Amino acid sequence: MKKKHYLVWSFAAALTMMLMNSCSDENSNPQEPDNPMESDANYVGKAQDGFTAEEWYPGGELGTTENVNSSCYEDEAPAVNEQGLHDNFKTGEMFFERQYTIDNGAFKGVGPAYLRKSCLDCHPSYGHGMRQDSYAIAYGNGNGYLMAIYTPDAPGSNDGNYIGEVTGMPQTGAADPFKAPIEADKIKIHWEHVNTMESGLAMKFPADGETFDLIYPEVTIPSEAFHTNPVPSNIAVRLESTIGVIGTGLLDAIPQEEIEKQYASEAAYFKSAGMDVSEYLNPKFWDAAGEKMAAGAYYSTWGTDGQFADGGEGKTGVYKAIKRFTYALTRASLQDGPGANAIWNITNVSRPDRPKLYSTKAWAKAMSEDPEVIAKIKANPQSPYYADGTDAGIKETVYNLLLPSTNQFDNQWHKFQPEMTANNFYDFMVWHRGLAIPRARNLNDKDVQRGKKLFMEWGCASCHRPSWKTGDDNYWTPNMIAGKLLPRYKNQTIYPYSDMLQHKLYMKNDIHGSWCRTTPLWGRGLSRMCTGAEDRLHDCRARNEVEAIMWHCYSKNSHAYQSALNFYKASKTDRDAVVKFLQSI
């Protein structure tokens, strides 16, 4: 894509309350057309009331782009150019944007089962997925939804183990001759309206009577949609939408010990306040009784040995990194994180360090027993699944080659070749780690300044921690790209507005597992301009900032209830000021 690139140049824990993963619609742009906001051109880089000069650059000198136009999410960070990685960045960008094919051209290898054919399908214009009324998968429709399909602990529960018949991120596409594990067109999404909040709050603001509406998704999948053996039963489904990919390299650069301090700081506050620490910090990550990090907070099974940027060794099973990525906090290093993993498991495009398929035994069995699948393979002697051409031979080969345990490059049935090379993966990671954060806007505006003041006073920053320092950024990489330079962000002050921990909001049909990492707020105010949508929260249920904030006080059990209650009780002028602040950072 063509775009301009620019070279530009602590927090005390209080009551944990998350706030406003959201952007606005017509109600949440408080700036009236006849009262235009003064341009910030003469103020950029200068301290303003309530803002330091550095806050104009949320990604620091090495991670911020001055571009605030519709292409800004696509920009490389200044670190990319300063470190001589521009060409690698542009090559890596192609692997994010291009549609993968089955067996043609440089971008081949999709399937045999997959979620999407390209990364861009889930991250429209590099941003957050868009709210959908159906699960249809089509290029450019912005459907960034993944499903969590699980056996609920109780009727209506958000908790329970993932089912084993389909992959953890369920696949709805397949390459011929196979059938998708789940047929996308049979998945139904219904948006329900909240009539009464569990907290008892009326759905209008008491200061002025302005009303608001809250919606949430109900998702159903009939048994006939599954092509697995066995077919799952007693299931529940929750949606999770992708978040934007910008600035993830900067989050990777936050020192591990600083995140550990954040856990300890919040735990100390809750204990001193006489609160149940294990209710406010996930026991999987924080051992309240021992007052220390729990074993589950660390990721150590990388599947491959690795190396640090300074040349040190990072062995799988030995090197332990704190989890910081995904809503569920399942990943640690970005180089083995959501993007590095997703380029494999979303498309099923193999590479030297990913020699196995993202699949399930139940799907392999169903495909090996499907007469239509066997007939198509039997009619094509060139198929890698053809074996000796007999039904029995094809059945055995299909089953074994589709198993998640089979090494695709070294087995007795067919030896495939890696579909993404180590060099291609390296370029992809230069791109992934090199994406910039757009600079802040309108920090000179009095409403924005008041919005930040209220944001801090109301306790929103307790979870949406404004800033971090990056330290030495001694990143980890898998051995297949060890020694190759990736964008590095040493000693930067960054402003993601996230504490990098999980909290609970107790929403209707909440996220699977109930706990959700605090989503960074930086750059989100540009979403509508960049992507055409501004849906927020984990499943895009919030259509603007106001709805996102009000979901934070849907229940009195919400960790953000008191913060959101302050917003609820505020005047429209103050509510609009907070929204304007969120749109500006």
Which positions does each model-derived feature cover?
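N-terminal cofactor/phosphate-binding cores enriched in small/glycine residues
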Residues: 93
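Bacterial N-terminal signal peptides that target proteins for export
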Residues: 2-10
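Electron-transfer interface patches adjacent to heme c in soluble/periplasmic c-type cytochromes
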Residues: 30-90, 100-429, 433-446, 452-585
